[in-house]
Amino acid sequence: MMTSMTALIADDEPLLRHHLNRMLADVWPELEVVALVGDGQQALTSIEQLQPDIVFLDIRMPELDGIAVAKQLNRGEYRPTIVFVTAYDEYAVKAFEQQAIDYLMKPLSEARLIDTCQRIKARQQPTVSPPDVGALLSQLQALSKPAQPQYLQWIRAALGDDIHLISVNDVLYFKAEEKYVTVHTLAKKEFLIRMSLKELLAQLDPERFWQIHRASVVNVAAIEKVQKDFTGRMSVTVGEQKLPVSRGSQHLFKGM
């Protein structure tokens, strides 16, 4: 006969904590929920004190998120069964499934909860191997990292009837010309791009290219000189050109 089990629920949304607690009372009356907590740090403290058999762990929580809590538990001596409560997309769910980890998707489904509870009970049998929590956490951590933005490295631009591929390293500055943008390069050539300056700017690395005027975007590395006259007007010298800097963009050169 299986001994009664205990559980802890960690979720920063009070309504969801209590909702899950009520659902567990319905689908698994023998399960004793020993604590409801609202953040990751409270979860770790309560788990250490109460040592529940099961932890229902929301992934996104203040203080420590669910992944950080699970990583700490996975390194410790006491390792409860973890059920992640998640609003993650399908790719993360596949990671759960590959590692045979229990998870509940928000909004909570009673059918899914029943299935999870049955799997937990079955897993108490000594012949069942424990899931590889560490491998799952590594996958989740990778999924949690924001993707690095991909900025333009090469630009397709026209010179006469020909299309050229220009490295952004060779660009001095871009200048808006009605429906086009002209590309001014180190080779003292001017190319045309058929897009607005706003569209182009969204694809450029903001650390390398600054919009200094509504009509101009300059390669910061190409700036040779910054000047300010007695009236407060600022300009930069790029190549052989002197380009005006709008008052709204002068903060970019503070400290220069």
From Swiss-Prot:
Q: Which residues are recorded with the post-translational modification 4-aspartylphosphate?
A: 58
Q: Which GO terms describe its biological process?
A: regulation of DNA-templated transcription
Alphabetically ordered keywords of this record: DNA-binding, Phosphoprotein, Transcription, Transcription regulation, Two-component regulatory system
Question: Mind telling me which GO cellular component terms the entry cites?
Answer: cytosol; protein-DNA complex
Claim: DNA-binding is one of the keywords in the record: yes
Q: Which SMART domains does the protein's record reference?
A: LytTR, REC
Cite the HTH LytTR-type domain residue spans from the record. Answer: 155-256
Name listed for the protein in its UniProt record: Uncharacterized response regulatory protein VV2_1193
State the organism named in the record: Vibrio vulnificus (strain CMCP6)
